[in-house]
């Protein structure tokens, strides 16, 4: 995992998004994302999710259900849409925390999964930059 740009909270705190995250997580989301750098098969699997989200061309072996997060406009500023996939996250595989992989329609993170949860994942897992994290789709 790695630190992001520190800007996710601006988007995550928006009430329009938070209301939609309740449908994904069962509750509102922590106002931030956990960034997971992806390599090898994990990157291929993530690209499959991007295909399911309609962001890349190709075929996907993934069977996860995409959940659409609608964008909106507020005070002349556009907030883009995203696609979420329900998942669980763990640091060692013993304890799992409900989460979702969030793939914004517009992102620079094409090799990094952005994970949302009702928990502050850095403390709940706990984890820090460089730690290996396990995510499984549900």
Q: What annotation goes with each model-predicted range?
A:
Residues 117-123:
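Short alpha-helix capping/helix-loop boundary micro-motifs
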Residues 124-128:
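A short glycine-leucine-enriched loop at secondary-structure breakpoints
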Residues 1-116, 129, 133-135:
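Long, compositionally biased stretches
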């Amino acid at each position: 995992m790695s630190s992001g740009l520190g800007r996710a909270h601006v988007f995550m705190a928006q009430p329009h998004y938070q209301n939609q995250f309740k449908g994904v997580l069962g509750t509102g989301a922590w106002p931030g994302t956990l960034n997971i750098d992806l390599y090898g098969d994990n990157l291929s699997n993530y690209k499959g999710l991007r295909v399911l989200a309609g962001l890349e061309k190709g075929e996907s072996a993934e069977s996860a259900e995409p959940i659409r997060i609608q964008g909106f406009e507020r005070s002349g500023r556009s907030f883009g849409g995203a696609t979420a996939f329900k998942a669980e996250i763990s640091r060692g595989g013993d304890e799992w925390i409900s989460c979702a992989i969030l793939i914004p329609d517009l992102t620079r993170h094409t090799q990094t999964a952005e994970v949302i949860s009702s928990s502050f994942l850095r403390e709940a897992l706990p984890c820090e930059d460089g730690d290996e994290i396990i995510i499984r789709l549900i």
